[in-house]
Amino acid sequence: MTGIFCIFMWYLLLILYMGQIKGVFGTYEPITYKTGCSLWGIFFIISGISIIRATWYPSQRQLTCAMLENILCMILAIISMILTIVELSTFKSVSYRNYGQAKLGRQISRVLLSFYPLEVSMALTYSIFGCVGLCRKKEDARTADTEEVEDAF
């Protein structure tokens, strides 16, 4: 759900920044918009799909893929947080015509900054439970092998 929210916020920023007028001081083009940080929400959607798939069809491969995708999502969310903090800490002057759009864009970045820790915590939680699931699968396989060997004697 947070991935979809981030993608919609990026779309709002796209519409907002496309309407800028080239002024004396130029247009406002933040680093998070150029890198498409909000578009990285697609990775959170893909990760959620893999978690659902691993729940429906549990296997070691599915759990490993879901866990690796969650780790990737954590890394991307941390990078997004850092880029957003850098964007919000610096503000170059823009044309007075674009000031309102730049101000609104910075407010959207502040909203997104509050969602990135949520994404990190959700991905971390799912990664921890994925590790627990993998450990249980390995323990169940070991006990099943031990029982088969004991039954053979």
Curated annotation (Swiss-Prot):
<feature type="transmembrane region" description="Helical">
    <location>
        <begin position="36"/>
        <end position="56"/>
    </location>
</feature>
<keyword id="KW-0675">Receptor</keyword>
<comment type="function">
    <text>May be involved in signal transduction as a component of a multimeric receptor complex.</text>
</comment>
<dbReference type="GO" id="GO:0007166">
    <property type="term" value="P:cell surface receptor signaling pathway"/>
</dbReference>
<keyword id="KW-0812">Transmembrane</keyword>
<comment type="similarity">
    <text>Belongs to the MS4A family.</text>
</comment>
<feature type="transmembrane region" description="Helical">
    <location>
        <begin position="1"/>
        <end position="21"/>
    </location>
</feature>
<feature type="transmembrane region" description="Helical">
    <location>
        <begin position="71"/>
        <end position="91"/>
    </location>
</feature>
<dbReference type="GO" id="GO:0005886">
    <property type="term" value="C:plasma membrane"/>
</dbReference>
<keyword id="KW-0472">Membrane</keyword>
<protein>
    <recommendedName>
        <fullName>Membrane-spanning 4-domains subfamily A member 13</fullName>
    </recommendedName>
</protein>
<keyword id="KW-1133">Transmembrane helix</keyword>
<feature type="transmembrane region" description="Helical">
    <location>
        <begin position="111"/>
        <end position="131"/>
    </location>
</feature>
